[in-house]
Curated annotation (Swiss-Prot):
Protein name listed in UniProt: Eukaryotic translation initiation factor 3 subunit M
InterPro entries, per database record: COPS7/eIF3m (IPR045237), eIF3m (IPR027528), eIF3m_C_helix (IPR040750), PCI_dom (IPR000717)
GO molecular function, one term: translation initiation factor activity
Organism: Coccidioides immitis (strain RS)
Source taxonomy: Eukaryota, Fungi, Dikarya, Ascomycota, Pezizomycotina
Binding partners and assembly: Component of the eukaryotic translation initiation factor 3 (eIF-3) complex.
Main location group: cytoplasm
GO biological process: formation of cytoplasmic translation initiation complex
Disordered: annotated segments: 429-465
Amino acid sequence: MAAPTNTLLIEGTFSELAEELAHYVDTIRKTQTEGSVHAEIAPALDKLREQEQSEEEPKPAQQQQILKERDEVLKKLVVASAALNAAPEKEITAAYNLVIHLVRQSSNPGMFLPRICAFLAKPFPSSPQHGPSIALSILSTIFNTLAPSDNSRYHVFLAILAVIRTTSSVMAFEALKTQLKNQLSSWIATWNLDEEDVEKLHLAVADAAKKAGDEEMSYNHVILALQAIPPSEASSNEARELAVRALISALTYPFVFDFTPLTSSDAIQNLRSAEPSLFELLEIFASDTLDAYEEFIKSTPLSSMHNLAESAEILQNKMRVLTLASLAASTPSRSLPYDSISNALRIPREDVEKWVIDTIRAGLVEGKLSQLKGEFLVHRATYRVFGERQWAEVQGRLMVWRRSLENVLGVIHSEKEKFVREGIAAANAAAESGREGGARGGAGERRRGGGGHQGPREVDLVGGD
């Protein structure tokens, strides 16, 4: 959509423009049998024209009456505006802009906008090639002329998505993706939508994204729609249909490996009784391995569950990747021999590296392959679920680290004590050596000092005689 603007430049009074639109609609409908729109609204337009020509400022009560009469005129004009889709291609945009301008002068524009958006979401017979782009341009104008907090934007946005969905316009959807990623959540909060409207909006985005070929965005918004279902509605038929759609998408889309958003959904949990086989398959993909999957499909063929047989290869490949992720997360030594991987995945040994690389690309593990040692050294592995067994594994690893740290601390403590002992011994030895050297030096000084004092006294005595 274009940069937001609240300006739509059209000159003329309400009565003049409404009369012009009525004549134009009557012209388009000239081959139809309906009565004249202009004739229907003429009495109300005469009253409005008198009030518009009055030089006196209308009082509050008069202003309310003006708005009421405008609304009555607009009810007839907006219903008749469905004919604008048959207008010549060059005139469609101008005609709808006139409708938008008139609607904005009503007491409640939101009363009319959903119907206008519904018209714009339908094809333009006069412009089969450029009709969708014209409709998107007009809808963008409506969206941008509304205040950001106006919840009428919700209906306009649904119409934009409907046009993209019906035309499979990849270019239009790509232009919208940035706003979907950056602004949709804030729009939902600003428009103050209830759960049903939030669900409807996310499903509209999901459908448009799927038509445009963006399966990942489509799946993400299906999950968001699923999460918008209130617990009180989780067992309804609509919730069950959406839950089945989300679950089948998660199983068959090759990029989905995290099933937590599904298992935490009340609507999905209700499938435990409504779709027991499908729910059991989800539990296998969420936390089990290839062995459990192969046992399951022996007793419950994929063809018996919503045509999943068509995706049998995708399901098996995904299960192999998930099994390898579980294997990497549970190995205590962080080293996975090629033979162990080959056995767990039911694949030839020479294919091990391919499957490890696929699992790395899926973001489930990180590590280093060693062809020389025939092993995969795990640097990081993602737990598919985190329950009692995983906590036990973490506890075991923490105990190993604790013992290792205790051993390191023991070595450090021993070395510290040894260092202190050696330091004390060295200090004592240095002190003892210093005492012995001092004693020898003192005796020599005394001997030298005694001879020096006797000489002078003898000289003094001789000199005295």
